[in-house]
Amino acid sequence: MLSLSSPPWLLLLVLFFFANGSATVVSLAENVTLATLPSTSPISVSFSTTSSVVAPISTELENQTASSSNLNTNNEASDEQTGNSNSNTSSHSRNINGLPSSNSNIDNANSNSSSVSSLSTTTSAISGVDQQESLILATPTALNGSGTPPEHQTIGQAPPTKGEQEAILRALDWLKEKRASDYGWGNDTHVVILAKELSGGRDPNDSVDGHVQVIQELEDTLSVKEMEIEILAMLDRHHTLPKPLDLDKLARYVLALGSLCKDPKHFHGHDLVATLQHHEPAQDIEFALTTLSACSSAAHVRKRQIRRLLDIASGVTDQSVDAIAMVILALRCIVTDHRHRHLQHFVRRPARGLATLQDQRGSFGSLRSTALAMQALQDLEYDPAGHWNRTAASRYILSRQRADGGWSEEPLQDGQEPDIGVGLTADIILALGWKGLGAVRALQCDHVIRESSDPTENGEPKLAVPFGLSSSAEESDAKNISYTYTLWVGSNVTESFSLSLVSPKNTSFFKAMTQAAEMDPRFIFEAREWPNGHYVHTLYGKKEEPRGYHYWLLYRLPELPDPNNTPGNQLIAPVGVDELMVEDGEHYLYWYKKL
């Protein structure tokens, strides 16, 4: 009976063994096939069986591939953020390489795998594409040399990387140690407050004792009060001595107040923004900074201010990194206003010029210049002609952080302490935190929302594109404008005459001169007509004298000319009398002087 029953049992055992072994062999074969693929092989992902949500991703990223070495170099910031350090073993790095492409080995492996394995592979691949899309949007350098980005792609929306966050916290701790007994930071109180507010300080999820938190808030309040005392003291010195205003510092005070959501137009009875706009700086970088401050407070930016910014932007080859960066920040603030969005394309040229100034180390010169350039260029739409490497810039700055958490320019100058660099450290915090000087306007404080809700700009729907750049239907509006026209005679201004004029919009200065001559005989003039326009050689009976170097020079001024404060050469009109269009609220001066 045993002999008769043995064959069925043995047969069953043999069949069972082969069945299990076969399954194991198939499973191992599949695993071996997948495991032997090189880590740099791009994974082919088909979206034909996925939902419509991921279909556009396949279209936008089709045929784009990236090697693991390039992505590890260019996307270091995002890799730090996700905690990835090894592209060959991490699933995140494998998915980075998983851009849509064709690979017969993968296709064969997928076809040999079971339905469950196929579903798992497809899900993983879709997840990888989702991660890749997020990475591209978060990192300016993700598409370096790997194809055309999606249209209207905005770059730089991701938060700071883990390494940047750690550096910021160390820097904030160092700044706290450097706070003086009056709870200020000397000449850098305003920029430290600005950096602390925009960086967000410590993570609110950090466990901080309630008593310690109250003390920190009180200390921060005392620091703000110290800054307010500094502002009032500066204004008092200006009115009583009188002492010229430090416009650069006043502009930074305005930005710091804005970061605290304090309205600088109502500062203890003072309108700091109006004070800024009343004194126009001669230096381009100071002018751009004051304009940025006014714009960040949602104040009206005058047309002539925008024209000057565009003039500076058009000559970026003659400007420093700091000046170009500040002009970009000012223009970007201006075009956020819906009335000026048609000027947005004027940001592109200076941004391209600035991007070309980045060196192989990632820096833009000094640490301060690099920090300012990072603030100006981040979040801009992708521009192949204006490509820059934020990861390299960040890496360069992080490599220069001192052991105590601060930064300083090296080599140190004679007499400088090794722990200097409070202002520089605050500037770098602004750059690493992805919220720089340009973020003040975006805070949407009450006074900013209130000012921005005004649908008009001095009665006009929006600013017309500056003359000579393009034409606009708004320029043809029959609207009168008011301005002044002044004559000065002599280098020491021995004679002075002024007229207040009202003319139709789009009136050339040559027509304005004709109008003035009809009103007052002292403004009668003579001019030669050349192919490129009129050349004025005689005014008020005074003819130019080339031998004696006496000429008539035309100035376009922000305020009524003052003989005790004569204008500089940077305010000379950039075009001739036929091309110069008179504008509302502007002041024009013809000065007969010796060169």
Curated annotation (Swiss-Prot):
Lipoprotein in keyword set: no
Places the protein is found: Secreted
Species whose genome carries this gene: Drosophila melanogaster (Fruit fly)
The protein's name in its UniProt record: Uncharacterized protein CG3556
Pfam families linked to this entry: Cobalamin_bind
Ranges of Polar residues composition bias in the record: 61-83
Positions annotated as glycosylated: N31, N63, N88, N112, N144, N187, N205, N389, N480, N492, N506
Superkingdom assignment: Eukaryota
Signal peptide location: 1-23
Main location: secreted
Example of a GO biological process term: cobalamin transport
Region (Disordered): 61-119, 141-164
Keywords: Glycoprotein, Secreted, Signal
MF-aspect GO terms: cobalamin binding
Recorded coiled-coil stretches: none
Cellular component, GO annotation: extracellular space
Biased composition (Low complexity): 84-119
Matches recorded under Gene3D superfamilies: 1.50.10.20, 2.170.130.30
InterPro entries per record: Cbl-bd_prot (IPR002157), Cobalamin_Transport (IPR051588), Terpenoid_cyclase/PrenylTrfase (IPR008930)
